[in-house]
């Protein structure tokens, strides 16, 4: 258990330091390319001053997280969990990239249309379930109740749960991302709880899965440093 915990902490620290080292240069480069946020005309007057704030910083967070997880867990690359979790991580990051890119190109605050965005999110969520079902050894439809060590097989409800876990979670972050630091703070609280739950089941959950979870915390902490208030 001590080695697993050390591995988790190492993933977090290395990733966090990497984000802090890379992000300043990335911000300068994004400013040079004029990849800035466009504020709505009907928005608050105080928000108008934020126009031009570099966007697409999520590219750095995701790349740093994935690089750290793969390098520090190179001995576990035969484990399908790490590739599956990376797929979902990068998949939703790609949806966000397309959304931001359209905002920059069009010079308006309208990125992907809601229907298109939800469709892409749905594709990633459904693909995740299909890949898990066919490539994860011993895949089943049981869910674990954290700390109580109780498992309940929910059968056909499982794919529905997975679908809404991804789509609802993604949109929840989007909705809270309107105020500086709000999505970051809430994400850190939620992810910290998941880390505690995962550590409580450390002997049943691959450490690569925990490492990917910590990669999310790298993203959240990096956002506090560079995008927070």
What spans do the regions from the language model cover?
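"…together with the soluble PPM/PP2C metallo-phosphatase catalytic core" -> "…together
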Residues: 1-37, 41-229
